[in-house]
Amino acid sequence: MLIFTFIGINLMSVAQETQLSTIASNGWANNSVNTVIFRKNSLISFNDSQYAAYYDQEQNVVLAKRKIGSTSWTLVTTPYKGDATDAHKSISIMVDGDGFLHIAWGQHNNNLNYAKSVSAGSLTLGNKETMLSAKENKVSYPEFYKLANDDLLFFYRDGGSGNGNLMINRYSLKTKKWTRRQDGMIDGEGQRNAYWQVAVDQVGTIHLSWVWRESPDVASNHDLCYAKSTDGGLTWLKSTDEKYSLPITAANAEYALKIPQKSELINQTSMFADAKGKVFIAGYWRDARETIPQYHLVFKTDNHWEVSKLNFRKTAFSLSGGGTKQIPISRPQIIVWPNGKHYAVGLLFRDAERGNKVSIALNDQLGSANWKVKDLTQNSIGDWEPSYDTELWKSKGILSLFLQHVTQVDGEGKANQPPTVVQALDWKPKNK
């Protein structure tokens, strides 16, 4: 086996193409804010360029850019800061079809922080802007997605944990303006709220899945629901193409899987949808009568939902309480690609059992038990969670991961750690 050594993190080659590049050496590392899984996105590509964003040790928002395939990055420290001491307040970026960079940062039940670049391809940001002004004072979990026509979607939560609503805005390349697509399309009826994950496939269908949470206590997470939209978020359908009557509630939601409360079910994981609209949802929970939480994949076959359990974990743990938790495993990212008549799948994660390295579980025939786990790094990455360049994977089949060694203290705590190296790891499966 070939072993490559780079500054910061050692890389083990498990594919035909692997490359590690150092973006910067001054990444904020006192919590996991730079590496939480709900950064959509931490890295993003457009044409031949890739962009990155992170908080430095002074809590400045820093932007970076390189040519795809290069290991040399250009950096710009923006005039904006975020409260990096709250790990919810991550940075999300996306590039629209005209090449303008859009960014949102520093959000946890507060006023919208949003800006875009002054010109196409630029790392210089303009002034902070509103999108629509209304319902932009209690923003959490900002996420950007790109539609097939290169317009953008912006998802966020309006309100707090337990009573927040999903909001969806759309940015038009033609008008250069944001409009509201949905306001509270998932209704917790004052009793619960949805923690969602989204995937947009190559034809532009929006796929949305979520768990319900009954209170700020993560132990109250339960069930896995699904909806999709083929018209940019205006109307929503079940996987059977039955039209939803909005809002979606606990009573009329499609349940991909029923999972009880107190099952160590994690919220805000990941999903993937291929060009044919096939949906794959990754998460972890503890099955009934078992003590150890395991990673699971939930996916739709011709007419029903199936579950594949990755049964390799040996260590029990419990999810309970509020704030950002220090958990021995990361939330998983999922990538899927065709492999002959089957689907191959990669589940990206970090597990204390494996020394907190960057790991990937590979299966060249989804539905089989043929899982092989490999480590992509030789050293610990701390409390990192995986986030990747969704557009580069769609366009070129290259997995580009944001890497940084970070420390997360339980219950929204702050460590006392010097800054660490921020890197991008590019990896391509052998059979893609």
Predicted feature descriptions by range:
Residues 1-17:
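Bacterial Sec-dependent N-terminal signal peptides
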Residues 16-432:
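Extracellular, repeat-based ectodomains that mediate carbohydrate processing or recognition
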